[in-house]
Each structure stands twice: as structure tokens, then as C-alpha cells.
């Protein structure tokens, strides 16, 4: 952890709630940070925040819905394509997923006594992969094969760590 707090100005674009935490999407005003574009800051990690008299023009082409399009949480992952993902969930886990959808694009494609299949349109970012793994053996990636292979690789690494 960092002991020294940084102080800097930003142009706030929007705030987003994810997993009971608030985040601010903002663009830094110094040349180094301005050229990086909007970044995401966790509000609970900000020690002090205040307004200034400085104003800015919100870019007309920027929208929060476009910025977070296909995102599971707050990891934007514009370097990842938006995929059509199919997850198979045990009947018990499917009840939970129905009550608390994993993503706004969630559609139940199939349902029977043993399992349900859910479809999503999103990016396979780190936080979505964590969510799949969080569901343990109760959820299986059916499509795309590339994501299934990625999950399998993570599980194999985990298995190696617990070999002994």
C-alpha cells in the first residue's frame, strides 16, 4: 500500500455503483493523464474530494453507456471484444442467478429441472472471469470455446498449486 496520498485535479464524467462500491470515471487534467483518457477511481479510496471553480466541456461523443458497453463491472476492457457467452448453471445456482442477474444482458435460453443456460453479451474481462470462478462447480462456460479454454487454464493452475 502507498503511504503518501496524491493530490490532483480531474474532470468528472460519471459515477457508477458496482458491488456496493461507488466509482468515479474522470479524466486527469495534467497532460500526462489527460492523454490517457478517462480513468476509474474508487471513491472509498479517496481521502478528500472537493469542487473547484474550474469548468470543462464534457466531450459530446462520450457517454457512460457506450463507455461501459459490454462490461461486467468496472473493468472496461476496450481491448476485449464483446462476446456472446453461454453459461450453464445448476438448478440451485440458476435460481440465484435469476434473482440477481450477473449482467443486464442476461437472458435465460433454456431451463429444466437439472440446469439452466443463460446468455450474455459482454467482454470476458478479469472481473467477469472472477465471477465465473466464484460460482465454482455450479456454473460452466459453454460458449465461446476461447473463454472455456481460458477458465480451464485458470483451474489447471489452481489444481497445480494444491497438488500436495
Briefly describe each language-model feature range.
Residues 1-85:
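Core beta-strand-centered patch of the WYL/Sm-like small regulatory domain
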Amino acid at each position: 500500500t502507498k503511504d503518501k496520498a496524491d493530490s490532483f485535479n480531474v474532470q468528472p464524467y460519471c459515477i457508477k455503483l458496482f458491488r456496493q462500491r461507488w466509482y468515479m470515471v474522470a479524466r486527469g487534467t495534467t497532460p500526462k493523464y489527460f492523454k490517457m483518457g478517462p480513468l476509474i477511481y474508487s471513491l472509498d479510496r479517496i481521502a478528500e474530494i472537493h469542487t473547484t471553480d474550474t469548468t470543462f466541456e464534457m466531450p459530446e461523443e462520450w457517454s457512460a453507456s457506450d463507455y461501459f458497453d459490454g462490461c461486467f463491472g468496472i473493468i472496461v476492457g476496450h481491448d476485449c471484444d464483446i462476446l456472446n457467452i453461454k453459461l450453464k448453471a445448476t438448478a440451485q445456482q440458476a435460481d440465484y442467478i435469476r434473482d440477481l442477474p450477473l449482467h443486464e444482458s442476461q437472458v435465460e435460453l433454456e431451463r429444466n429441472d437439472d440446469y439452466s443456460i443463460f446468455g450474455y453479451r459482454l467482454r470476458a474481462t478479469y472481473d467477469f472471469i472472477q465471477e465465473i470462478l466464484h460460482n465454482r462447480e455450479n456454473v460452466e462456460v459453454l460458449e465461446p470455446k476461447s473463454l472455456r479454454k481460458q477458465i480451464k487454464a485458470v483451474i489447471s493452475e489452481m489444481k497445480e498449486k494444491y497438488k500436495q
